[in-house]
A protein has these predicted regions:
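Beta-loop motif signature
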Residues: 37, 190, 197-226, 231
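Internal/C-terminal transmembrane anchor helices
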Residues: 160-183
Length: 254
């Protein structure tokens, strides 16, 4: 009985110690930021990574983690986490600015293919708002439609009926139009998978094996589009249209 009592006491002490040492993500974030401000960048990276290990993520977390990697000249890691920050919040201006500096450390100079006039106009128009805003606009249109209908129904004067009827039509057209834009925007984002090259130098082959012809090589930090997978190989496409196969271990999907 006494032995069991000691075991229980030791177990409770260990459990209590774990509870005392346990830290919330907010506390870890604060400590990581303090480490970063003290120029202890590797320590900050470990602490920010600890928050990710807890299953927490945010645009600010990825942004700070990218900054710490940038300070240590970790090209691939900094670009990867800036991209992650922008994926969660495309309007993160700090990440938009800093990723440009990080990309200047890359070796590969890739000239994107020119867009067609129609594609350029559509991309420019869609980029006016984020996906979240486009998703809200159809709901707002329905609300305006309902309110206009009620005002139209209870109005006595003809001029007011005409005004509210016009608003009804505009709200209906706007709601339907923005719904399809939001749906197109969402599917476009979901259909595109990107990755960042992490190896110092990666050979890209014409076929998903190392026996085929080596077409070109890529270096750390280069962003590629993921097209397909086969075993431990991944088919990638560059912004300039080049296509090839690289090993999955050489890149990290966003």
């Amino acid at each position: 009985m006494r032995t069991n009592r000691y075991i229980i006491i030791v177990f409770l002490m260990v459990l209590w110690g774990q509870l005392v040492l346990a830290q919330t993500p907010e506390e870890l974030f604060k400590q990581a930021t303090e480490s970063y401000n003290a120029a202890q960048y590797q320590k900050a990276i470990d602490q920010y990574q600890g928050i990710l290990d807890l299953g927490q993520e945010s645009s600010a977390l990825y942004y700070n983690l990218a900054n710490a990697h940038y300070k240590l000249n970790n090209v691939a890691e900094s670009i990867y986490y800036y991209e992650k920050a922008l994926k969660l919040n495309p309007d993160n201006e700090d990440a938009q600015n800093n990723i440009v500096f990080a990309q200047q450390m890359t070796v590969d100079a890739i000239t994107p293919l020119p867009k067609t006039w129609l594609r350029g106009v559509s991309d420019c128009f869609i980029s006016i708002f984020s996906l979240q805003v486009w998703s809200i606009l159809p709901i707002l249109g329905v609300f305006v439609f309902v309110m206009s209908f009620l005002l139209y129904y209870f109005s006595q004067k003809t001029i007011f009926k005409r005004i509210f009827f016009t608003l009804m039509l505009l709200a209906l057209i706007g709601s339907i139009g923005t719904y399809f834009i939001a749906d197109f925007h969402k599917k476009s984002i979901e259909s595109q998978r990107y990755a960042i090259m992490f190896d110092k130098a990666t050979p890209v082959f014409a076929e998903p094996n190392a026996y085929g012809a080596e077409m070109f090589s890529l270096h750390e930090g280069t962003k590629v589009e993921v097209i397909d997978y086969l075993n431990d190989w991944v088919k990638i496409r560059l912004a300039d249209g080049k296509i090839g196969w690289a090993r999955q271990t050489t890149l990290r999907v966003l």
